[in-house]
């Protein structure tokens, strides 16, 4: 039996976390290692379903997504903050209180100031570093930003969803593409960290419109992106359209594929994608709130797995197509992504190329943008 090694190949991988492509991992000796810390903040989420929203967008039912169905009292908020702070680990250097689920700057000024004052109290004591919130692009104006300019808000996420006017109209968003462009530009001029939330599979959207939207967002250079698949929530206006047959949601495979293309586009522009897929919850997982659509509790993992499958196929086709068996080595942090959920990628590779076996092995000398394939042949010419 002959064994062959493919020449070293660098593949563009999901997260290089600041490493130079192709650079090997620099690992200290075991007795020199220090506890690893993460640049990502520890998020303390406070959900304010539909707070400040001028109307209901067709896809939205924040109460179902967040599991929060009543207005949050000051005591509720303080209790949640205290509960979450108990779970902070030494790996997270920074802590952020985050207000999600509504249109934060669309709330009355007194409510905005009250909530931010509560959160700022934790910053003042040193237990929390900063505050973030999500809001609509059309709420970004000088008057509203004056409300928060002396408070420790560092990050603002915009519910953009699409950069196509036809899609925005079909989903009844009520804001325009210029609203988003002006909002991002204004926030960046004021040195806020800016995030953009996008959705795949919205009514009126197409693959071409989706990619065009992503390109327009990329040109605005936000700091990070979240990507969510559109699902039909039982309490959303979209549910009626789905029942009448006016709206057909994407399949899971379609949603994963479209999200993959967005991820790779943003990755090529050095824009972080910090989340893909809805946050798993008991309400979503038990199926009582979702009528249809591409919900999966490990949606992001499915996207990463498809990216790794593409990488493996490309390398196999270049140097191991006629092998009987192969071994693929990857950075330890990427082994599960390479295997795919329930070893799905392994089975796909075996079927596609007729391999007797596909072994996956961790290799901490490989950078996060590398795979190495070794092939075995029974016979040699």
Predicted regions: what they are:
Residues 2-5, 38-42, 237, 244-381:
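Auxiliary Fe-S-binding modules of radical SAM enzymes
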Residues 3-38:
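Arg/Gly-rich low-complexity intrinsically disordered repeat tracts
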Residues 39-76:
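Canonical Radical SAM [4Fe-4S] cluster-binding loop centered on the CxxxCxxC motif
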Residues 48-52, 228-233, 279:
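Short glycine-enriched loops at secondary-structure junctions
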Residues 53-57, 233-239, 284-286:
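Short acidic/His/Gly/Ser-rich catalytic and metal-binding motifs that mark active-site loops
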Residues 65-78, 87, 101-230, 234-254:
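Conserved non-cysteine loop/helix-boundary elements of the Radical SAM core domain that shape
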Residues 89-94, 125-128, 320-323:
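Short helix-terminating capping/connector loops at secondary-structure junctions
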Residues 95, 129, 154, 223, ...:
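Short acidic/polar active-site loop segments enriched in Thr and Asp
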């Amino acid at each position: 039996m002959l064994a062959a090694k493919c020449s070293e190949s660098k593949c563009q991988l999901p997260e290089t976390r600041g490493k130079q492509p192709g650079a090997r991992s620099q690992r200290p000796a075991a007795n020199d290692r220090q506890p690893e810390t993460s640049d990502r903040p520890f998020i303390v989420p406070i959900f304010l379903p539909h707070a400040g929203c001028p109307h209901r967008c067709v896809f939205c039912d924040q109460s179902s997504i967040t599991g929060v169905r009543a207005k949050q009292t000051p005591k509720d908020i303080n209790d949640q903050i205290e509960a979450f702070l108990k779970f902070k680990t030494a790996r997270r250097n920074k802590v952020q209180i985050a207000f999600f689920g509504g249109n934060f700057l669309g709330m009355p000024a007194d409510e905005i100031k009250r909530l931010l004052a509560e959160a700022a109290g934790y910053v003042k004591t040193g237990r929390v570093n900063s505050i973030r919130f999500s809001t609509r692009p059309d709420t970004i104006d000088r008057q509203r930003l004056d409300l928060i300019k002396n408070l420790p808000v560092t990050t603002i996420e915009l519910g953009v969803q699409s950069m196509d006017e036809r899609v925005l109209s079909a989903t009844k968003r009520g804001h325009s593409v210029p609203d988003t462009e002006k909002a991002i530009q204004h926030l960046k001029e004021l040195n806020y960290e800016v995030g953009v939330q996008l959705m795949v599979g919205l009514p009126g959207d197409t693959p071409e419109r989706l990619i065009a939207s992503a390109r327009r967002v990329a040109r605005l250079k936000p700091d990070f992106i979240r990507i969510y698949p559109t699902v039909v929530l039982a309490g959303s206006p979209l549910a009626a359209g789905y029942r009448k047959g006016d709206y057909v949601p994407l399949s899971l495979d379609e949603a994963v594929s479209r999200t993959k293309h967005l991820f790779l586009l943003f990755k090529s522009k050095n824009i972080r994608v910090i989340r893909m897929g809805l946050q798993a919850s008991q309400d979503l997982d038990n199926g009582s709130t979702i009528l249809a659509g591409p919900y999966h509790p490990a949606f992001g993992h499915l996207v990463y797995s498809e990216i790794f499958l593409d990488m493996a196929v490309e390398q196999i086709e270049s140097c191991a197509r006629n092998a009987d068996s192969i071994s693929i080595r990857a950075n330890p942090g990427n082994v599960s992504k390479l295997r795919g959920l329930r070893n799905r990628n392994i089975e796909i590779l075996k079927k596609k190329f007729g391999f007797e076996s596909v072994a996956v092995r961790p290799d901490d000398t490989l950078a996060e943008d590398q795979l190495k394939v070794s092939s075995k042949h029974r016979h040699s010419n």
